[in-house]
A protein has these predicted regions:
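Carbohydrate-active catalytic/glycan-binding domains of CAZyme proteins
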Residues: 1-358
Length: 360
């Protein structure tokens, strides 16, 4: 069995991709540097910190940014046609006065270890941007359009625009394509993939708190219209029905589920294996009770999934509740050596596990 969380501690907003027999997960780092750690595995059970994407503070300026801002929700993809990795990420500058001031960027590299290109500015239309590499070579950026007007559903709606890699800029203005697959509100974290003739739009809903979940929509055309999965949400810690579209609060502790060891499960990303299996990574948390304080932060877990005959993604156990222990894949077992118990600060280089604040 695979025991969750696979990435314990501060590892939120996971995005998974595969190149050959190698699997990689990127997570958020906010104001901590170096930015965007990449974890590696060959069996989805044993994971190691492999590299960081943002290691040059000249390419990303995090100085003077407050806590919980800066690098949000990286989207890591591998384009097989180009044999190239892409990362789309946002730099959150401010969340004051209902307005989220965010700049979204794209970088790419021939290897997961780099060298990474200069950041290309995409837009500031919303956060949690990600990229789709379509079969015909075209590329699309999907993101959340932030709603600032009082009385409107918060935080907004999922939008799509095309990206021109030659000109290194988006084409036109983002078009609204999806308002969610449930009534939990607080839609975010869109990931767009293509499979079996459908464009699949995976999102998080309910806020990144106790009503968090993973939802799915699909369409035959990338611009829509998108239909929601009739079983939405497909993964969550709070499987009940709720209407929260008019509530911008993200925490929602009233939805704490005492029957779930993993709380706040949402913000997912899936990967298909050459064995015919599918797995989904998602963020989660393990709070102290009754205080509901998550001192380890938001962590990364994994769930075994399966595709139905009519093309929807389901948890392999037939439920929706995120599980602590999930079946292993058919991939060969690849255990890793134990982490070193000490580090030599007199050595030329240190182990890669250290982060530092760079906002001052």
């Amino acid at each position: 069995m695979i025991h969750n969380p696979i990435l314990p501690g501060f590892n939120p907003d996971p995005c998974i991709c595969r190149k050959g027999d190698d699997y990689y997960v990127a997570v958020s780092t906010f104001e901590w540097f170096p930015g965007i750690p990449i974890y590696h595995s060959k069996d989805l059970k044993h994971w190691e910190l492999f590299t960081h994407v943002l290691t040059d503070d000249e390419k990303v300026n995090l100085k003077n940014l407050p806590s919980a801002k800066a690098i949000w929700a990286p989207c890591l993809t591998y384009n097989e046609q180009e044999d190239r990795f892409y990362v789309v990420y946002g730099v959150m500058n401010s969340m004051n006065a209902r307005y989220f001031d965010v700049d979204n960027y794209l970088i790419s590299a021939p290897s997961i270890t780099g060298p990474w290109s200069e950041p290309v500015y995409l837009h500031s239309a919303g956060f949690d941007a990600s990229i789709l590499h379509d079969d015909d070579g075209r590329k699309y950026i999907v993101s959340l359009e932030w709603e600032t007007r009082s009385g409107y559903e918060q935080p907004g709606v999922i939008c799509l625009c095309e990206y021109d890699p030659a000109a290194q800029k988006i084409i036109g203005y983002p078009k609204r394509i999806w308002r969610g697959g449930t009534d939990r509100g607080c839609i975010e974290a869109p990931h767009l993939t293509k499979r079996g003739g459908y464009y699949y739009l995976m999102c998080a809903e309910g806020g990144t708190g106790y009503n968090h979940c993973v939802t799915m929509g699909r369409a035959k055309n990338v611009w829509g219209p998108y239909e929601g999965d009739p079983q939405n949400p497909i993964v969550t810690s709070a499987p009940g029905v709720s209407y929260e579209r008019d509530d911008p609060d993200h925490l929602k502790p009233k939805y704490f589920n005492p029957d779930s060891l993993l709380q706040k499960s949402g913000h997912g990303s899936y990967v298909d294996l050459p064995t015919g299996e599918t797995y989904l990574v998602h963020l989660c948390a393990r709070p102290f009770i009754p205080e509901l304080r998550c001192t380890l932060g938001r962590e990364t877990s994994i769930q075994k999934m399966q595709w139905t005959d009519d093309g929807w993604l389901r948890m392999a156990d037939g439920g929706r509740l995120a599980q602590v222990d999930v079946p292993e894949s058919k991939l060969p077992d690849c255990p890793l050596p134990l982490l070193p118990e000490h580090d030599d600060f007199d050595a030329p280089t240190l182990l890669p596990y250290y982060l530092s604040l760079i906002h001052i």
